[in-house]
Regions:
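OB-fold/S1-family single-stranded nucleic acid-binding modules
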Residues: 212-235
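Structural detector for short beta-strands of small beta-barrel domains
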Residues: 150-169
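Gly/Gly-Pro-rich "capping" loops immediately C-terminal to redox-active cysteine motifs
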Residues: 30, 43-83, 165-166, 175-192
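C-terminal capping alpha-helices of c-type cytochrome domains
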Residues: 83-136
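Electrostatic cytochrome c docking/interface patches
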Residues: 17-34
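The canonical Cys-X-X-Cys-His
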Residues: 31-45, 118-122
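Short boundary/loop segments of OB/S1/cold-shock single-stranded nucleic-acid-binding domains
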Residues: 136-156
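Flexible glycine-rich surface loops and low-complexity tracts that mediate binding to linear polymers
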Residues: 200-218
């Protein structure tokens, strides 16, 4: 009878453990869906910084300490916050209340259940090798793990490589290496700099057209020096 009781207790303990694991897996699965709100500004890939810093391997780490990300606020860098369940719950709920003056433009998640599920996912995704595991398990697509990276313009055709760009009155006038010429209204052009390996080669500018009728464009330079050198005010 005593042996049966021990066996029954062990079985009940095993069943309880399996139930907890199933509950945790379900939370992670739901959290993966909620992660879309984070993926709009962050990457899970190491060293890939977008609007916000990479989240790779940040579980249990101090906030504001990624050396090659320079856009932290002083308040966050001095906060001493360690990223784990309770701190992430407060941050995701009301980032402005937790760190006044933060530049993270995110209104927060009011639903405590959604936050709980999201944090369960982040615990897995923000650990070492988390992005690869989350993609491999089918919880998120690779594109979500990478985040919304800008177009790779390190190698483009003559139809995008800019031969001349000048500003005159209310317009930008772009001539590409294939000889095509495009006049754009000045407010429809975004001047960008991409210093990453995915950006233009030094001394080059790249045209990226957009808009429903192609009337909008980004002009991407590799540095501010190239902007000053290649962009002229000339009519």
């Amino acid at each position: 009878m005593f042996r049966l009781s021990i066996g029954a207790a062990a079985l009940l303990s095993l069943m309880a453990g399996e139930a907890r694991a199933q509950d945790q897996n379900e939370m992670v699965k739901k959290g993966a869906q909620a992660y879309r709100i984070c993926a709009a500004c962050h990457s899970l890939q190491p060293g890939v910084h977008l609007s916000g810093p990479s989240l790779a391997d940040r579980w249990g780490k101090e906030a504001g300490t990624i050396g090659d990300f320079g856009r932290y606020t002083e308040a966050l860098k001095k906060s001493g916050i360690i990223w784990e369940e309770s701190s992430l719950d407060g941050w995701i709920a009301q980032p402005q209340a937790m760190i006044p003056g933060t530049t993270m433009t995110f209104r927060g998640v009011e639903d405590a259940e959604v936050r709980k599920n999201l944090i369960a996912f982040l615990r897995e995704a923000l650990s070492t090798g988390g992005a690869e595991r989350m993609v491999k398990s089918g919880l998120i697509p690779e594109s979500m793990a990478t985040g919304p990276m800008p177009e790779d313009v390190s190698s483009v055709g003559d139809n995008q490589r800019i031969k001349e760009i000048r500003h005159c009155r209310d317009g930008y006038y772009v001539t590409t290496a294939d000889g095509a010429q495009f006049p754009f209204w000045e407010t429809n052009v975004r001047i960008k700099i991409d210093t990453s390996a995915r950006g233009p080669k030094k001394g080059e500018a790249v045209l990226v057209r957009s808009g429903m009728v192609g009337d909008r464009a980004s002009v991407v330079f590799s540095s501010l020096a190239d902007v000053n050198q290649l962009l002229a005010e000339k009519c």
